[in-house]
């Protein structure tokens, strides 16, 4: 829907580990040739420094496992003050962040992959990543396949995986 309605640019906003995850997909997108107006910013910098490219037509993408990250909550408020739309991920529903974002995704243990699906979906919709559907299909198998990868990696990992992952 956001892509259909149009947008000026995309801001990946986070703090701590969330910013780290956002940064990984930001750089991956660039390596894939992404020409979308994509910005990566620390939530505190977003709040206090601002960005001349940020407008009511921007899309802000945030995540917070707890749903209570204060800087991210404040970034959502700032986005809404100018009329920008916010896409968010949390693992705990009925939290401030879950209640504030315009589009919410919630699950457990999927934040890293979620960042990839969001940014790559924007790229797909812009005609810049035609392998999106294949990637998402492959990612659905990761939880079960990763255990076998651990087992195949070395004997110590196999012992651990046999004991705790099956």
Kindly give the residue locations of the regions a language model identified:
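Glycine-rich phosphate-binding loops that contact phosphosugars or nucleotide phosphates
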Residues: 3-139
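Acidic catalytic cores of enzymes that act on phosphate-bearing nucleotides/polynucleotides
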Residues: 35, 164-166
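Internal, active-site/partner-interface "lid" segment
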Residues: 124-162
């Amino acid at each position: 829907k956001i892509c259909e309605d149009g947008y000026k640019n995309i801001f990946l906003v986070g703090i701590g580990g969330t910013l780290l995850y956002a940064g990984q997909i930001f750089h991956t997108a660039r390596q894939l040739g992404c020409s979308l107006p994509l910005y990566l910013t620390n939530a505190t910098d977003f709040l206090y420094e601002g960005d001349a490219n940020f407008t009511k037509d921007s899309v802000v993408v945030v995540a917070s496992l707890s749903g209570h990250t204060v800087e991210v909550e404040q970034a959502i408020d700032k986005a809404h003050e100018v009329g920008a739309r916010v896409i968010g991920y949390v693992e705990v529903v009925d939290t401030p962040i879950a209640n504030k974002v315009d589009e919410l995704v919630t699950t457990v243990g999927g934040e890293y992959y979620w960042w990839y699906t969001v940014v790559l979906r924007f790229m797909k919709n812009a005609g810049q990543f035609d392998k999106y559907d294949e990637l998402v299909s492959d990612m659905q198998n990761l939880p079960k396949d990763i255990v076998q990868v651990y087992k195949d990696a070395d004997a110590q990992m196999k012992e651990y995986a046999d004991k705790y992952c099956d």
